[in-house]
């Protein structure tokens, strides 16, 4: 099926892009990598008479190392993040998450900003970015603002982005010393399909004890879940009793819904299993 005709607008700056989106309102949509948007338009599930091409704006496809972290431009592709020596050295779990999306052809085109702005509940990167403490930079008619990633997602395919506002980059702070993170994906269908669930965990240890633990899960509910109430783990060893309490805490904070990849009951069971696996994997790394 072919796409209905549309006008491709090519701004040269962020203010120009925002002005184009504001001018055309609901008839316009920002175009990044286009892997999802183009497919939906081909399927006639969506139609926009105007697409604002962000590829013509300089600076949105850069990975910049800053004093306190790494800033990733919205148009950086999944494949570049998967293979980047800087990302693999500083955030191997993040590289793993991006490397498990779809297939190489998709990863060569899809952009990190478009991935997050689409807000599909099955996305791989959000859990990994959440446990790493990422924040996103947004730009609109009122200028720039920064939002913690945990506050960015509002619901299924819904974010805090205002009309004519763009996600322009993602900032990931460097991990403290003696910290590690991991991302695990569980598939029930093909490897190229959406995951049944994804689990990310971040652990900081000192003298054999846990200083901080963060856990996030995706693919279960309309938004990714960053598990709260884990302060009880501080200064504890991750023995079977502590892990059992952790799993109960996770279980209380998730509300899986059924889809083609698993029932509510099955996803809840797999969430416990993969959180346990992720935490044990991190703990054993020292």
List the predicted regions and their residue ranges:
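C-terminal structural segment of proteins
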Residues: 1-286
């Amino acid at each position: 099926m072919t796409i209905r005709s549309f006008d491709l607008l090519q701004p040269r700056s962020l203010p120009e892009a925002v002005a184009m989106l504001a001018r055309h309102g609901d008839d316009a949509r920002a175009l990044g990598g286009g892997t999802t948007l183009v497919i939906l338009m081909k399927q006639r599930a969506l139609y926009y008479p105007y697409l604002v091409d962000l590829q013509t704006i300089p600076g949105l496809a850069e990975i910049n190392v800053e004093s306190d972290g790494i800033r990733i431009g919205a148009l950086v592709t999944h494949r570049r993040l998967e293979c980047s020596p800087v990302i693999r050295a500083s955030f191997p779990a993040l590289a793993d998450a991006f490397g498990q999306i779809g297939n190489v052809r998709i990863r060569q085109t899809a952009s990190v900003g478009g991935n997050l702005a689409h807000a599909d509940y099955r996305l791989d990167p959000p859990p990994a970015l959440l446990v790493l403490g990422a924040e996103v930079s947004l730009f609109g008619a009122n200028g720039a603002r920064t939002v913690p990633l945990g506050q960015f997602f509002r619901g299924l395919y819904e974010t805090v982005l205002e009309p004519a506002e763009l996600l322009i980059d993602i900032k990931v702070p460097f991990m403290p010393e003696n910290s590690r993170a991991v991302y695990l994906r569980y598939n029930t269908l093909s490897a190229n399909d959406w995951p049944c669930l994804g689990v990310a965990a971040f652990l900081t240890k000192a003298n054999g004890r846990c200083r901080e633990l963060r856990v996030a899960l995706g693919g279960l509910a309309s938004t990714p879940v960053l598990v709260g109430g884990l302060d009880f783990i501080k200064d504890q060893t991750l023995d079977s009793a502590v892990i059992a309490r952790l799993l109960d805490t996770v279980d209380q904070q998730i509300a899986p819904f059924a889809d083609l990849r698993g029932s509510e009951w099955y996803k809840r069971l797999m969430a416990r299993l993969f959180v346990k696996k992720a935490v044990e994997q991190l703990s054993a790394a020292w």
